[in-house]
Each structure stands twice: as structure tokens, then as C-alpha cells.
Amino acid sequence: MCILFVMLTTEEQEIEITSDEIKNWHPLFALPCYDQQLTEPFFMSFLKTAIGFKEIGLKFSVSTLSDSLISRARNQLVAKFMANKEYTHLMFIDVDLSFNPDDILKMLWHDKEIMTGAYPIKDINWNKVSDAVKNGIEPDKLLDSSIRFVVNPVRFADSKIAVDKGAISVHDAGTGFMLIKRSVFEKMFEEHPELQYMDDTGLLNEEERKYGYALFNSYVDEDQRFLSEDYGFCRYWQNMNGEIWTDPSIELTHLGRMKYTGKLIDYLVNNSKDIETPE
């Protein structure tokens, strides 16, 4: 087994990716594009990804879908993914995110069934900003103090987060930057035949229609929490004893009225006492 020249170095870790791993991967980038639009920062990130993957010989494909209903868009993209047996991973990326292409390689390297990158919520927690000002935080660090992430970490009885090769186990994660192995959908289809639906959009061909399952579905869980379609997907998987992981070293920018940029690892270090433990 020869080692390819791919070596990723971050402030947290250094990893190597082999040529055999590169040959065995074929992710499908699934890009829900509301109103057929995407952001310029996302486009530049994805262009760099395409060029970088081409340089190292990593096969990939792309599927976009415009739908006003995000849950249906995600389910339709899953159907397209499952209909092509060459695809090994489904990589959801929301088109209002910008990212580092190396982080996708890092997610593949982790070799988890579901691996995510946590991105900031498009909101400012002004109470956190007020506390930061009182504590003498520098002005250019105030935004960092206000950021929250689309993720709920898992904690265990000893109050320590489960860690594996720098990744941490999480309770809920946003689908906006999520890598999913084919095996996940195979298991979920078998577990939830009642979620199969008849496509009436005309966006799926005959083969793809076989894989129309409402896995990304908003509903009220047993704790009376209203779950968004991404958290609903997480709960289906967890109820099958599946695990969801995130790499907290990944930095993502969520684009809205302003740019919300952050790393989950910084949030965990600075706010550990404020993190709620899911029941």
C-alpha cells in the first residue's frame, strides 16, 4: 500500500490518506439549492474542492435540486444517491456555507457512518456579548463569544465527551455539512419500510423512485421536542443504536446578513460549563 502525497496538517492533528483509500471513495455531493441559487463563497469553496479532488484522483459526482421544501429535497437527493451503486458516501453541503476542501478529506478519513462539521447558527447571542464586554474581551473577539452551533454534544456520566481520532460523538447535528455512508441508508430502509413514499414530483426516474423514503422528516419526538428534518434524521438513526460524530476542528462560515464563522472546538473550550446534557 503506497502512501499518497495527501497529508493534512491542522493545529489539532496531522493525518495521512492512502492511495487505496482515495481509490475506494466516490462521494456524491448533494446540494439543495433553494430557488436555484447559491452563494459566491460556497461556489469558490466548491471550485477549490473540485480542483483538489481532481489533482489527487478522487472520484466525485454532484447533484443539485431546487425545492421549496428542504426535507423533500434531501430525501430526493438520497434516492438519487442510492440508485447509483458507484457512490460510497453522500455529502450534504448547504449552499450558504463556505469551507476548506481539506475538511471533506478529513471527514472521509474518520471512516464513520455519519460524520459532520458543526457550523454557527445565523444569530447573535447578545447576552453572551454583554458578558464578554463585562469580562474585558477584546472588541474583535466579541462575535466569537456570541456564536452558537447547530449541534448538541453527547455527554456521559463522567461529564466527558466521547472522542475518537479527534472526532466527538454528538446527540444532534445539522445536515448542512454531513457525510453519510451508503450503509446508513440501507439499514434505515430496512428498519423503516413505513417511510417509503410515492414520488409525485417527476424529479426521480424509475430506478430512483425505489429509494424514496422520508428519512429527513420533521416530527415531535418522545420528549415533546419538535425536531427539524435534520435532527429528525439523527433521531431515527440513534433509535437504531447508530452514532453521529463531528470533527470540532472544522471551521465553517454560515452566510446570512453577515458572516458567522467558528470552530466547535473553540466553543467547547470556552463554554464547557454551559453545554446542556441531553436526556
What is each residue range found by the language model?
Residues 87-98:
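Short beta-strand-to-loop acidic/aromatic patch adjacent to the donor-nucleotide binding site
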Residues 54, 108, 237-238:
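Anion (oxyanion) recognition and catalysis
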Residues 59, 96, 113, 243-244, ...:
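Residue-level detector of anion-binding/catalytic polar loops
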Residues 8-9, 22-24, 191-279:
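C-terminal catalytic/acceptor-binding lobe
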Residues 2, 6-67:
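N-proximal low-complexity "stem/linker" segments adjacent to membrane-targeting elements
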Residues 68-73:
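A short, glycine-/small-residue-rich helix N-cap motif at loop->alpha-helix starts
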Residues 76-89:
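Active-site nucleotide-sugar/metal-binding loop of Leloir-type enzymes
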Residues 100-204, 211-217:
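Conserved catalytic core of nucleotide-sugar-dependent glycosyltransferases
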